[in-house]
Amino acid sequence: MTKKLKILSVISTICMIPLLLGGALVTKTGSADGCGNSWPLCEGQFLPTKISFEMFIELSHRGVTGVVGILIVYLTYLVWKELRHNKEVVFLAFSALSLMILQALIGAAAVVWGQSDFALATHFGISLVCFAAVFLLMLQLFEIDKKLHTEDIHINKTHRIEIYAISFYTMCVVYSGALVRHTDSNLACRDWPLCVNNSSFGISDYNFYQWVQMGHRLAAGILFIWTVILTIRMVKHYKNSKVFYWSWLITLGLITLQVLFGALIIFTSLNLAIALFHALFITCYFGMLSFFMHLSFRAKRREKYSNQS
């Protein structure tokens, strides 16, 4: 049964990727109203006879959401049936299920009643946390037989706090990026890294969309520098742990690609493939940070038990 759970968790994690990218695609292509204000039906029909491009994108996103939802429900059921004694696994499974339901309801509410750009930006953030929960559940299932060799990693208190802080800050950066999409501020600034490279900052002349765009760039730049500094420190301090060592190097690579593809969005005038890769890299990056948070929680718990004994 453990093997079945592992396979199902891998499939669920992989399927979360097109779910997240599908949501970004809906926004990028302006397909949010592809089915009108009808949900779960499309234009009041199960399968409309005339399907436009926008309708196809929206229907595909709903279909993927439904499939992933069924996978997570089944995975949660099996976890409860077979591993209810493992509190970490049960918590992650029910967290993933709850977040999946929440993000689906927010998506449905956006279709039926409409939502502000700020509320819609939250939709992607919740989906990202849901992905992190499924990803961690998969890792936890593989850790049952100690194949990842993470049980002996001790993360000191200072580094744990830094991991929590950068993870929380990443969510803020993700929210600002989602706000860029939902307010159509992607090309509010035609240059990079400044809004207009051949002039002074001129921030007093920025309109709302330029403030949103440049605010996101500033936040992303800080995140990149922070990740570089933290990676150097973690690699030096935990070089004896191969999993931790390589995980941080992968994380640094992901944030580097994230910044690169963010710039390419401007240079290619919002090329769709580039924009989707931009969403993919931040998803994987946050997944890695979630892994570090998981290890930090575990290290704190071991430290607490050690002090008590």
From Swiss-Prot:
Amino acids binding heme o: H61, H123
Ranges facing Extracellular side: 28-62, 110-123, 181-211, 269-271
Sequence positions that bind heme b: H216, H278
Catalytic activity: Fe(II)-heme o + 2 A + H2O = Fe(II)-heme a + 2 AH2
Subcellular location: Cell membrane
Protein EC: 1.17.99.9
Example of a GO biological process term: heme A biosynthetic process
One Pfam family it belongs to: COX15-CtaA
InterPro entries: COX15/CtaA_fam, COX15/CtaA_HemeA_synthase, HemeA_Synthase_type1
GO molecular function: metal ion binding; oxidoreductase activity, acting on NAD(P)H, heme protein as acceptor
Pathway: Porphyrin-containing compound metabolism; heme A biosynthesis; heme A from heme O: step 1/1
Cytoplasmic side, ranges: 1-6, 84-88, 145-159, 233-247, 293-309
Keyword Iron: yes
A GO CC term attached to the entry: plasma membrane
Residues annotated as transmembrane: 7-27, 63-83, 89-109, 124-144, 160-180, 212-232, 248-268, 272-292
Keywords: Cell membrane, Disulfide bond, Heme biosynthesis, Iron, Membrane, Metal-binding, Oxidoreductase, Transmembrane, Transmembrane helix
The protein's required cofactors: heme b
Disulfide bonds: C35-C42, C189-C195
Function: Catalyzes the conversion of heme O to heme A by two successive hydroxylations of the methyl group at C8. The first hydroxylation forms heme I, the second hydroxylation results in an unstable dihydroxymethyl group, which spontaneously dehydrates, resulting in the formyl group of heme A.
Matches recorded under PANTHER family: HEME A SYNTHASE
UniProt comment concerning the protein's domains: The N-half (TM1-TM4) and C-half (TM5-TM8) domains are connected by an intracellular loop. Each domain is formed from four-helix bundles and they align in a pseudo twofold symmetry manner. The N-half domain is the substrate-heme O binding domain and the C-half domain is the cofactor heme B binding domain. The cysteines of disulfide bond Cys-35 and Cys-42 may be involved in transfer of reducing equivalents from quinol in the membrane to the active site of the enzyme.
Family indicated by similarity: Belongs to the COX15/CtaA family. Type 1 subfamily.
Subunit details: Interacts with CtaB.
Protein name (database record): Heme A synthase
Gene: ctaA
